[in-house]
Amino acid sequence: WWEDVANNPKLSPVGPPKVMKVEGKLPQFKILSNLSVQYEWEKPNPDFLPALASASPLYIYRPAHYMRQFHKDFAANSKLQKLVTATKQRNWAALHNKMDNLYRNDNIDLPVLQPWVCVSKSSSNRLRFKRNAFFHRIDPQGQQLPYVDEFIFGIANNKLISAKTGTG
């Protein structure tokens, strides 16, 4: 994410997220292992950890194995151009950003680390989420979270909610 997305001027025209800077300076970034990275600032960054834990968290990772098919540095140009045309995007960067939106749940093929995975198209009036079998948290008894296997959100006009509730 850091090298291929956050610091790519085509994908992030204003650069990395503001919360990654301390007094205007970006951190040093190191890959420690296949599973670990390190961000190191010259001075403390009091905003970084709260940003990771916020309701709309700072996503400092991406599923490279999936996203590389939409990135000009990794995908074959002919394949990438076909995808750009098929999805009616103006260029590869617009396609990459469309397929990479972790906040909208509009790409049901995007691998996520969240507790549930959206399995319905966002254009529908029902959003269906299934438990992510790869979610990384467990409870104190060792059972994988979340407990709920599936939930469905019905999207309706606020004038219809009373009627829908009344009819079950």
What are the language-model segments listed below?
Residues 1-11, 38, 48, 162-166:
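Aromatic- and charge-enriched surface segment that lines or borders ligand/interaction sites
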Residues 3-4, 101, 114, 127, ...:
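Solvent-exposed, polar/charged alpha-helical surfaces in well-ordered, non-transmembrane soluble domains
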